[in-house]
A protein has these predicted regions:
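Short glycine/proline/serine/threonine-rich loop/turn segments at secondary-structure transition edges
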Residues: 5-14
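Beta-strand-rich extracellular modules
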Residues: 2, 17-21
Length: 168
């Protein structure tokens, strides 16, 4: 089913005609049904999660479909499939509000990118693509901003740059 690009959101009446040309069992019926046209898609929106940062969209599990990664005020870092379902290994329980958007980088040189984000209690987490903890680091203060990832010193290893509310 498709709709005109100018169609209004809401319930759209759809008249379905059912016919059988079988001579032994002729059949004809007309059924009126309503189809709901909305901007939501299967699995979305996700309710009961307060998100105050931008999501990261990437295909980290190699299935050729992008996943959605984000932190929330319930202290969990989520990984969702294209249909809004939790990925295996997610959510990761960081224990504190996550307002930092995530960044990506291959921090252990295994050619697989990891996720990095911060919490309201100064914890910086690096997660493997499957939601398991790779490493963490504590810095005094709240990490509200997204970490930046770059090879700052040219040694082929990525550095993580972030700030805290305490100017650290």
């Amino acid at each position: 089913i498709s709709s005109d690009q100018n169609a209004s959101l809401g319930n759209i009446p759809l008249n379905v005609k059912i016919n059988s040309d079988d001579e032994d069992f002729p059949y004809q019926n007309e059924v009126l049904i309503e189809v709901k046209l909305s901007l939501n898609q299967y699995g979305f929106p996700s309710n009961n999660i307060t998100i105050k940062s931008s999501p990261l969209i990437a295909d980290l599990n190699g299935d050729l479909y992008n996943e959605i990664y984000f932190g929330s005020d319930d202290g969990k870092f989520y990984g969702l499939s294209k249909d809004g379902q939790n990925l295996d290994g997610f959510p990761f329980d960081a224990g504190y509000d996550i307002r930092s958007s995530a960044a990506l980088g291959d921090f252990n040189s295994d050619d697989i990118e990891e996720l990095v984000f911060g919490t309201s209690q100064g914890m910086l987490y690096v997660l493997n693509h499957d939601g398991t903890l790779n490493m963490n680091y504590y810095a005094p203060g709240k990490i509200w901003g997204a970490p930046a990832v770059s090879d700052l010193d040219g040694d082929s290893d990525l550095e993580i740059v972030f700030t805290t509310e305490n100017s650290n």
